[in-house]
């Protein structure tokens, strides 16, 4: 398993988990918003393991903000961070994935790309675009490479903790049929399924990992806009 991100300490923690399972981990620190880092990651992976079978695109994120507070630059940055990175990373990986007999790409999207709620216009629109990118890639790369997406709901991560209050957490739990916030392992298990032979007849799909929510359970309490807004 090859892992890459900007924070090497986090990567080393993942590597230890991988090695505890009796597998080999390759740590490649880098900024994956930079195409050169992506090419280097693919090259390092192929050099170390001799092949590339699976790509999981998990770069992304954008903080919540009211519509009138979202600048053009931040809107475009959200697309670059959530969509363009997946496009570029996949393009760098595909020449090697084509040599595999069981190649798969998994894009980590979000429930925000399927449901609308206030405060997530940049993030949600970008994640919806990532879902559509997944469908197009599935068509482009079939039959050699399967491409699917995961749409997590509320997951207990540092990003969520940054704005999660006690009241908001209670509302999110009550708005989720399974009555809990998801864990990182819930998303990881879905990724393992989509990367494995168990999903060999699945491509171009979006797998919700959201506790069964049919609408956004995240209400930031942003006020209605009125005629006094200028």
Regions found by a protein language model. Name each.
Residues 66-67, 71-79, 172:
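Substrate-binding pocket helix/loop in short-chain dehydrogenase/reductase
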Residues 67-68, 101, 115-121, 179, ...:
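Active-site loop immediately N-terminal to the catalytic Tyr-X3-Lys motif
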Residues 110:
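Residue(s) in the substrate-gating loop at a strand-loop-helix junction
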């Amino acid at each position: 398993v090859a892992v890459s991100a900007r924070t090497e300490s986090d990567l080393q923690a993942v590597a230890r988990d991988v090695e505890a399972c009796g597998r080999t981990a390759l740590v490649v620190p880098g900024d994956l918003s930079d195409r050169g880092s992506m090419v280097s990651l693919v090259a390092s992976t192929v050099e170390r393991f001799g092949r590339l079978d699976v790509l999981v695109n998990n770069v992304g994120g954008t903080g919540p903000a009211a519509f009138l507070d979202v600048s053009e630059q931040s809107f475009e940055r959200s697309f670059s961070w959530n969509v363009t990175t997946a496009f570029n990373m996949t393009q760098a990986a595909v020449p090697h994935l084509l040599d595999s007999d069981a190649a798969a790409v998994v894009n980590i999207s979000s429930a925000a790309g399927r449901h609308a709620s206030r405060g997530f216009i940049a993030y949600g629109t970008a994640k919806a675009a990532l879902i559509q990118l997944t469908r197009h890639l599935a068509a482009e790369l079939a039959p050699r490479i399967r491409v699917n997406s995961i749409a997590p709901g509320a997951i207990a991560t540092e990003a969520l903790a940054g704005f999660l209050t006690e009241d908001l957490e209670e509302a999110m739990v009550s708005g989720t049929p399974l009555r809990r916030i998801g864990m990182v392992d819930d998303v990881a298990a879905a990724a393992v399924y989509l990367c494995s032979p168990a999903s060999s007849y699945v491509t171009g799909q979006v797998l919700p990992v959201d506790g069964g929510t049919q609408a956004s359970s995240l209400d930031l309490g942003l006020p209605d806009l009125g005629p006094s807004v200028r």
